Amino acid sequence: MAPSLHPLIDNGITPGSGSFAGGKLRCHCASDRVEVTLNSNVAHNHACGCSKCWKPSGSLFSIVGVVPRDAVSVTANASKLSVVDKEATIQRYGCKDCGVHLFGRIEKDHPFRGLDFVHVELSDEKGWQEPQFAGFVSSIIEQGSHPKEMDEVRAKFKALGLQTYDVLSPALMDLISTFTAQASGIRFANL
């Protein structure tokens, strides 16, 4: 039996609310918790198997979505935040004490610049967009999952109604490719 995909989806997916307007994320510290306020629901929420995203203990995947950068503000204990990996494209801000990643920001020229990556499981509020797909699924092998477990992992996602990809969803890959094409001088009509 495959280990936990993620606690938010192991027992099924709870639908979000289209009218949900955001909430607060908090780190796992017992006191003086870092608090980040999101003034928006997430988009492109998904299970991510990459090696960079923060995952709950025992989980193979993170659950991560994006919000506009201007919808994110640190509202308590900002001094406890630091960038986890300064070389990474996504500058993930984690709590120095408990290690939880509160948000990830892209500072350089990139198709996702202007969007911050967040983990809605860090919120007590309900209504966040439910996961839409699973990305970077094969990447869990690089983190120690046995290749023979992959069929079972993909079957669990399929049973949840989530398409699996070994990169991102087609819509996000199209966004990346459009950005790259435009950066190289290609122009498209009606964009």
From Swiss-Prot:
Enzyme Commission number(s) of this protein: 4.4.1.22
UniProt-listed Gene3D superfamilies: glutathione-dependent formaldehyde- activating enzyme (gfa) (3.90.1590.10)
Pathway field: One-carbon metabolism; formaldehyde degradation; formate from formaldehyde (glutathione route): step 1/3
Binding annotation for Zn(2+) 1: 27, 29, 95, 98
Function: Catalyzes the condensation of formaldehyde and glutathione to S-hydroxymethylglutathione.
Domain of life: Eukaryota
SUPFAM superfamilies: Mss4-like
Catalytic activities: S-(hydroxymethyl)glutathione = glutathione + formaldehyde
Molecular function as annotated in GO: S-(hydroxymethyl)glutathione synthase activity; zinc ion binding
Gene Ontology BP, a term: formaldehyde catabolic process
UniProt domain CENP-V/GFA: residue ranges: 20-166
Protein name: Putative glutathione-dependent formaldehyde-activating enzyme
Cofactor(s) the record lists: Zn(2+)
Top EC group: lyase
Annotated family: Belongs to the Gfa family.
Keywords for the protein's UniProt record, in alphabetical order: Lyase, Metal-binding, Zinc
Species annotation: Penicillium rubens (strain ATCC 28089 / DSM 1075 / NRRL 1951 / Wisconsin 54-1255) (Penicillium chrysogenum)
Family matches, as NCBIfam families: formald_GSH, PRK05417.1
Residues that bind Zn(2+) 2: 48, 50, 53
Co-factor binding details: Binds 2 Zn(2+) ions per subunit.
